[in-house]
Amino acid sequence: MLGAKIRFGRAPGLLPDFSYSPVLPNPGPLRPEDRLVFLHVEKTAGTTAHHVLAPHFPEDQVCPVRFGLHLPFWENARLARYRFFSLHASLRMIDPIPGPKKIVTFLREPVERLLSHYNFWRSLREEVIDEEHLDHIRYVKHLALKELLSPTPLATTPDFWNLHTQRLAGDLFMAPSGRAWRDEHELLDAALANLENMAAVGITEYPELSFQRIAEDLDIPNRYDGMRLNVTANIREDEPHRFERFEEAPMDDETAERLDRATRLDRRVYDRGKSLFRDRLRVGLVLKGMVPPHVPTAIEDGCELVLGHHQEGNILFGPYCALPAGSYLATLWLRAGAASNRKREGSITIDVCSGGSQKIHAVQSIRPLILSDQWFDPVDIHFTLADPASLVEIRATVAGLANLAVKRGVALRLI
């Protein structure tokens, strides 16, 4: 249960009918009568997705509204002019869009999404907040993470409580019938049901495959070129007049517990979204004759990251974004390129870092010749955290090697 401190629903008669429709199945290619709606959940690669999807439509068919709260104030005839909508919105907010809709969204590991969202708001300069009247962001900017995640301020900071679930269910406070949700389980069930009927779902951690899958589901060209826009870690360098440096939020046990509670429903949504994504990708590959049906595709926690000569790659531990102090043993699984393509002077470097690569905790070099080119070999790396650390990553760097495959599944244990 959400608890007595959170009041669902609104007073009878205070507002007009707020019932809305759940997502209706609309499979198949994008048709001329369809409206493509991109449901932009903050910090899920949504800005990138907008710039990939919008060029498929003439400029006068792209709705200029970016926030769903504004749609109810537009007449149906005006909304009917547009075929592409890219909105920070819940499903209830997009209900006024006329005609059949194909809804697309991206999902991101919930803890990482929440922390990125929090840090994005904290990095906004005060003068920008003043100029753009972003008082809700000012409130969050000056809140410690532990305070932000306490149960009581949900009414003022709903973006930091299971946001994927909220957006996909339709509304935080009311069910499609217009009544209050009975409990958080009903809210989650609605979100999962709507997720099943999405025209396409992308996973933030796998952008290339996500945009490929979306393009194939909608039967449109794939315009993704590797761009990454509005990335929290880079915004200060990209737009220094708008963003400033911020101190990383401390992560103690109580904060980690609150972070876990604030994302527990979203983890269910994210896991189901990854499963749907994997299944759709598998079907697409089978139809192309690329893999037999019994071979699992590589979009799971054990997904491969393949690096070529002089390439680098990061493997986010996820969901181990906030690890307590202590000594750890991480096990990776590596497979080297074909022996005939390997150079004896080649090298593989594995390191463990945290805080957006600011702290290096361990470095290990591996000779490519000790690795099999047919199966994955386990490689252990020990590291110690003197203090609790967030955004812990393992990085692999390759030199003098045709290719290296790294399984994204990392076994981690405290020793």
Regions inferred by a protein language model and the residue ranges of each:
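PAPS-dependent sulfotransferase catalytic domain
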Residues: 70-105, 112-226, 359-362, 373, ...
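Noncatalytic modules at the cell exterior or secretory-pathway interfaces
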Residues: 82-83, 382-400
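Extended extracellular/luminal ectodomain segments enriched in beta-structured repeat modules
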Residues: 322-331, 388-391
